[in-house]
Amino acid sequence: MLQLQFFLVVAAILFCIGIYGLIVSRNAIRVLMSIELMLNAVNLNFMAFSNFVDSGLIRGQVFSVFVITVAAAEAAVGLAIVLGIYRNRATIDMESFNLLRW
């Protein structure tokens, strides 16, 4: 049987990959994917702690479903914003997203 430490290490690796993608990437789609990867790492932590700490309660699973719902809404809104900026600027480079400059 897998231990809690295994899930925590996997979640930490996923979160670090997401942070790396968030810092390094200049593409808006990759940034959104990195944020989703970080949220999935958080969900893995919720599920692991819910299973190993108190397996009788389902609070971790319920909160994980809530985070998945919010992440789906965030992805939809983020992609809509990126699509709108792409139609105006013809690029999805994060450096050109500064809409306050003329």
Swiss-Prot record:
<feature type="transmembrane region" description="Helical">
    <location>
        <begin position="33"/>
        <end position="53"/>
    </location>
</feature>
<dbReference type="GO" id="GO:0030964">
    <property type="term" value="C:NADH dehydrogenase complex"/>
</dbReference>
<dbReference type="GO" id="GO:0048038">
    <property type="term" value="F:quinone binding"/>
</dbReference>
<keyword id="KW-0874">Quinone</keyword>
<keyword id="KW-0520">NAD</keyword>
<comment type="similarity">
    <text>Belongs to the complex I subunit 4L family.</text>
</comment>
<protein>
    <recommendedName>
        <fullName>NAD(P)H-quinone oxidoreductase subunit 4L</fullName>
        <ecNumber>7.1.1.-</ecNumber>
    </recommendedName>
</protein>
<dbReference type="InterPro" id="IPR001133">
    <property type="entry name" value="NADH_UbQ_OxRdtase_chain4L/K"/>
</dbReference>
<comment type="function">
    <text>NDH-1 shuttles electrons from an unknown electron donor, via FMN and iron-sulfur (Fe-S) centers, to quinones in the respiratory and/or the photosynthetic chain. The immediate electron acceptor for the enzyme in this species is believed to be plastoquinone. Couples the redox reaction to proton translocation, and thus conserves the redox energy in a proton gradient. Cyanobacterial NDH-1 also plays a role in inorganic carbon-concentration.</text>
</comment>
<comment type="subunit">
    <text>NDH-1 can be composed of about 15 different subunits; different subcomplexes with different compositions have been identified which probably have different functions.</text>
</comment>
<dbReference type="GO" id="GO:0031676">
    <property type="term" value="C:plasma membrane-derived thylakoid membrane"/>
</dbReference>
<dbReference type="GO" id="GO:0016655">
    <property type="term" value="F:oxidoreductase activity, acting on NAD(P)H, quinone or similar compound as acceptor"/>
</dbReference>
<keyword id="KW-1278">Translocase</keyword>
<keyword id="KW-0812">Transmembrane</keyword>
<dbReference type="Pfam" id="PF00420">
    <property type="entry name" value="Oxidored_q2"/>
</dbReference>
<dbReference type="GO" id="GO:0019684">
    <property type="term" value="P:photosynthesis, light reaction"/>
</dbReference>
<keyword id="KW-1133">Transmembrane helix</keyword>
<keyword id="KW-0618">Plastoquinone</keyword>
<keyword id="KW-0793">Thylakoid</keyword>
<keyword id="KW-0521">NADP</keyword>
<dbReference type="GO" id="GO:0042773">
    <property type="term" value="P:ATP synthesis coupled electron transport"/>
</dbReference>
<dbReference type="InterPro" id="IPR039428">
    <property type="entry name" value="NUOK/Mnh_C1-like"/>
</dbReference>
<feature type="transmembrane region" description="Helical">
    <location>
        <begin position="65"/>
        <end position="85"/>
    </location>
</feature>
<keyword id="KW-0472">Membrane</keyword>
<keyword id="KW-0813">Transport</keyword>
<feature type="transmembrane region" description="Helical">
    <location>
        <begin position="4"/>
        <end position="24"/>
    </location>
</feature>
